[in-house]
């Protein structure tokens, strides 16, 4: 999607309140990707993305900015936590696995696009598979009259199938089952082995299962995709997108910084993780199940609160790989008010729509919204600052009884006013010990 930086920021304004500096820097970084692709291949190789370091408390919009943009522009995107990785040689996930996770995200993205483009062919394949079970093909040498009868019956059955009239009927189908797919605890590094066993036919078998037709349609989608879609071109496109459009969001990078003021270094592998991360961010080749991926042009966005450490506590080489730094603003009551009123799918709209399913019309008057914003802001000041996430706990507590008794208000309109907010939350916010547990 070809958007100017201003258009990108305008899009983000619908979902993330404030944080103009962060939006501007990320918008420029994404636009530079488009600019790079317009250049000659020789120049493209030399121009590397300027990675970004976002500094700010939890809940101020760091992840949301990157995730919204990646989704809108159709870029492969993953969010990982730096603290979950271990130095090579230690038990745990190594940093290269984040690149493999990115290729998996790209693979799913491209597969879904191809499935959408070829949905008519895929649906036809699924229909034919199901119709074969409902109306087995005629043997050879049957008269023309019988063939015509069969053809008419087949079309009638096809119409019923498309209309959903047969959804509750039960059929027996054969589906492929991979022994690796049945174990959710296998690490992603097993991807290469899964590909090998698929090629040689070990570990995969056809199993017969009885199920309703509506379930059979979903079960046959993967098989249809494997048969109809060009798997090699999908892998090639996924690899290309990972390299040129991939975004890896590294959260909690402050957790692997070794604080200069902390003489008791409890985790000596922190610096090791940084050193393992360095070649990935600098640009290196990583083996994935879809091929060798060059990380030179992946955009890395690192983020952290840096309460107990500073960006300068990261090793100098890694600091140099994140030249763009932006500090995100903490959220006050005015920002909370905007968060509750401005976004397309604001929190209040979400709760209103949820209760609408119970035939209850929920509304908030303006003074009530201001009071909610004040209480959330105060809770963040007096307790740990968790940013906009505080609004979730505040509103949940406010609407707890109403959500529980929603059926009693069916067909009515319920307006939340300032008085109700004060009654439900006033005593709690005044009692700091109680507030720590509830809000």
Curated annotation (Swiss-Prot):
GO terms for molecular function: ATP binding; ATP hydrolysis activity; peptidase activity; proteasome-activating activity. InterPro entries: AAA+_ATPase, ATP-dep_Clp_protease_ClpX, ATPase_AAA_core, Clp_ATPase_C, HslU, P-loop_NTPase. One of its GO terms (biological process) is protein unfolding. ATP binds at residues 17, 59-64, 251, 317, 389. It is found in: Cytoplasm. One of its GO terms (cellular component) is HslUV protease complex. The keyword ATP-binding applies. ATPase subunit of a proteasome-like degradation complex; this subunit has chaperone activity. The binding of ATP and its subsequent hydrolysis by HslU are essential for unfolding of protein substrates subsequently hydrolyzed by HslV. HslU recognizes the N-terminal part of its protein substrates and unfolds these before they are guided to HslV for hydrolysis. PANTHER family: ATP-DEPENDENT CLP PROTEASE ATP-BINDING SUBUNIT CLPX-LIKE, MITOCHONDRIAL-RELATED, ATP-DEPENDENT PROTEASE ATPASE SUBUNIT HSLU. Belongs to the ClpX chaperone family. HslU subfamily. A double ring-shaped homohexamer of HslV is capped on each side by a ring-shaped HslU homohexamer. The assembly of the HslU/HslV complex is dependent on binding of ATP. This is ATP-dependent protease ATPase subunit HslU. It comes from Campylobacter jejuni subsp. doylei (strain ATCC BAA-1458 / RM4099 / 269.97).
